[in-house]
């Protein structure tokens, strides 16, 4: 009984000192809400993440080799957040964002905030200010490797700057993490891969910017290009594999494959065909695909073409796939589900 009184007294003192809600029992009727998620634009990846997308109010890291689809995936997330009326910002440290490509993926350029900072400190200060404002829902930093410390920029070429970027990232993570949670703003860091020297056994790959981001990120996605999609002799896209390397909100280590078509982004209809067959929603007999009593095409490309031409059927298939995985039917506020992009 004395312990219960002592605990009650301690809780009351903490609430007086730090405000109501600063400490509470997790299962009690409290303002702790279910984790909100924003769709990635890929139905398969939404399912693999376990909550229907990337969690809001968290730090996310997306890394992979060059031209693997890192920026494409993040632009799809931006487009999905904008569909829900969210405010998005893109911190383009690489100075390489293609506005026309972003527009093709569904990004509203008129509503997108963009910054092209000169130094790493400036970039992270901009991120911190936007997060603390509480008015921004999603911030993308492209990329961690391009967040060059001011001391390195002002120094001579060839000067040794041991660990300066890692120190910068470590300080930024400590400063950002609390305000990101309070403002419910998602911050996505795109990262590049480097090779460790002298690794005989194990994976020699590592990401730039030290270890701080690995610890603070709630979700880490490893994205890789696995093959080419050809139309006769022309390469028209890539098959892409994403592995959920770390996930604090659902079981990790799930993998998903989807197509990224050049100039169009993630092929949603291709995913509906593949995931529909896996979920038993779409039947495959030989090379023929059918939905219900209706044949939708001979061969995968013809089935994709049918779904592009029949968005109602595609919407029904998507709803049934989501339902089979226990996900919400729609990710938009209008309750009509995601818009199908012709891909």
Curated annotation (Swiss-Prot):
InterPro entries, sorted: AAA+_ATPase (IPR003593), DNA_recomb/repair_RecA (IPR013765), DNA_recomb/repair_RecA_CS (IPR020584), P-loop_NTPase (IPR027417), RecA-like_C (IPR049261), RecA-like_N (IPR049428), RecA_ATP-bd (IPR020588), RecA_C_sf (IPR023400)
Protein location: Cytoplasm
One matching Pfam family: RecA_C
GO CC annotation, single: cytosol
Keyword DNA repair listed: yes
Recorded superkingdom: Bacteria
Binding residue positions for ATP: 64-71
A GO molecular-function annotation: single-stranded DNA binding
Keyword terms of this UniProt record: ATP-binding, Cytoplasm, DNA damage, DNA recombination, DNA repair, DNA-binding, Nucleotide-binding, SOS response
Keyword DNA-binding: yes
Chief place where the protein resides: cytoplasm
Gene3D superfamilies per record: P-loop containing nucleotide triphosphate hydrolases (3.40.50.300)
Protein's job: Can catalyze the hydrolysis of ATP in the presence of single-stranded DNA, the ATP-dependent uptake of single-stranded DNA by duplex DNA, and the ATP-dependent hybridization of homologous single-stranded DNAs. It interacts with LexA causing its activation and leading to its autocatalytic cleavage.
HAMAP family referenced in this protein's UniProt entry, alphabetically: RecA
Family: Belongs to the RecA family.
UniProt protein name: Protein RecA
Gene from which this protein is expressed: recA
